[in-house]
């Protein structure tokens, strides 16, 4: 919620906020009816690779079932534009770098598997109904901050990713 407040302050625009479980299709339907969005940027999901190997069912339930719930609500409200936050983990452990978009897919963990499954689900939806506009983003861990430095990755505790860890050390927090 804090990040949303910073975005509102920076942009001067109030952003509607709903705290809900992405797997709750009825609540999502109500939100879509209320807000009438024309598109969705989908970042919701569990995202720790290591954790996904310990509790894979939680990842499948939240990431897969949650996204299917979201897609149902979108379709029922004629919202057929989605940008999906996938992951470079769908490439597994490539033999060379840099990784190119057309490299073979080789998932090595449940988190990456949920991302690949969802890419396939979204591709199937598009093939079945070309009114859908689907963008799949396969990026690595992004890092950066707004020029004001009011908005950027500021993890609680010890970060899971290298660059946020380095920045925390640099500013004396670790």
Name the predicted role of every residue range:
Residues 1-145:
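N-terminal Rossmann-like NAD(P)+-binding domain of SDR-like oxidoreductases, especially those catalyzing
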Residues 123-174:
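NAD(P)-dependent short-chain dehydrogenase/reductase
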């Amino acid at each position: 919620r804090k990040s949303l407040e910073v975005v509102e302050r920076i942009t001067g625009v109030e952003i509607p906020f709903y705290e809900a479980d992405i797997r709750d299709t009825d609540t999502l339907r109500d939100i879509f009816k209320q807000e009438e969005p024309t598109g969705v940027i989908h970042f919701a999901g569990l995202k720790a690779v290591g954790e996904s190997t310990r509790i894979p069912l939680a990842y499948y339930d939240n990431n897969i079932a949650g996204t299917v719930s979201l897609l149902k609500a979108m379709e029922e409200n004629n919202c057929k534009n989605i940008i999906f936050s996938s992951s470079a983990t769908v490439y597994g452990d490539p033999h060379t770098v840099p990784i190119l978009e057309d490299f073979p897919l080789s998932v090595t963990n449940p988190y990456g598997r949920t991302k690949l499954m969802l890419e396939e689900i979204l591709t199937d939806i598009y093939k079945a109904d070309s009114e859908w506009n689907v963008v799949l983003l396969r990026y690595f861990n992004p890092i950066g901050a707004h020029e004001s430095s009011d908005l950027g990755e500021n993890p609680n505790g010890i970060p899971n990713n290298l660059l946020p860890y380095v920045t925390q050390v640099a500013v004396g927090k670790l």
